Amino acid sequence: MQQSTLLKPVSCYGIGVHSGKRTQLTIEPAKENTGIIFIRTDISSENNYIEASYLNVSGTLLSTTISNDHKVQISTIEHLMAALWGCEIDNAIIKIDGPEVPIMDGSSKLFVFMIECAGKKLQNAPRKYLKILKDIKVIHKDCELYCTPSNHMTVDLTIDFNSKAIGKQNLSFSNQESFTKNIADARTFGFIKDVHDLQSKGLALGASFENAIAINEEDKILNPNGLRYEDEFVRHKLLDLFGDLYTSGTNVVSSIKGYKTSHALNNELLHKIFCDTTSYKFVTASEL
């Protein structure tokens, strides 16, 4: 398997779900072994770029935020990162003229559409895989996430909310190629009762029925068209997991199991993997 990038640049324009600010975002092709790099074009400085790395994750409250050493940051990168992972884009430059990736419809669907419109170009370098060599677990209260050695990527994810609209949902996933059809269009979600508190903290300022599933105090879905899937909630949590894991810089090959995962837990797992050099190795497809 070879690395890949886009054939040509592609752009979108939208609002940030938390900041409420409108930004333009462009995904551009990049050379082999570049990885995913974000550039804040509204900051005229050589310090305006941020590598999409787990090491640069500086915030995990309701979304994933990355920052560089100069305090330049970009938030809510996970849906775009999931689309890049699902479309098998190894190298890309993301240019954005504001502090937050547009939320679009609350899923990865439109980012996948953009990438498919741009087209994909194979490159003259082998794709790298992060092969897990030993059992690794992270736990926070009743939330847990762990990975075990495997020659294939599989995920078993369970969510459990004290809400009749969501409840307990489980989903197993083992085919990266099915991401764009079965996971990418699952939307983010939230509770109406939390909106006032979140907005008082500068969050959810751009949230609407157009970009999130809204659940009221009576546990009713308020969106006029309802859900896209009966289990859309766990599908979206799986989407978030893939986006966060792609900040490893490559494709994780492991059997992964999670219960009530979060952006913080996802990032903690990567830190725990990389802090022990005997727990992983980078391989090519032929070495899996």
Swiss-Prot record:
GO biological process annotation, one example: lipid A biosynthetic process
Catalytic reaction annotation: a UDP-3-O-[(3R)-3-hydroxyacyl]-N-acetyl-alpha-D-glucosamine + H2O = a UDP-3-O-[(3R)-3-hydroxyacyl]-alpha-D-glucosamine + acetate
Membrane-spanning ranges: none
Annotated keywords: Hydrolase, Lipid A biosynthesis, Lipid biosynthesis, Lipid metabolism, Metal-binding, Zinc
Binding site for Zn(2+): H79, H236, D240
Catalytic residues of the enzyme: H263
Pfam families xref list: LpxC
Domain of life: Bacteria
SUPFAM superfamilies per the UniProt record, alphabetical: Ribosomal protein S5 domain 2-like (SSF54211)
Reported function: Catalyzes the hydrolysis of UDP-3-O-myristoyl-N-acetylglucosamine to form UDP-3-O-myristoylglucosamine and acetate, the committed step in lipid A biosynthesis.
Similarity comment: family membership: Belongs to the LpxC family.
Name used for this protein in its record: UDP-3-O-acyl-N-acetylglucosamine deacetylase
Taxonomic placement: Bacteria, Pseudomonadati, Pseudomonadota, Alphaproteobacteria, Rickettsiales
Protein encoded by which gene: lpxC
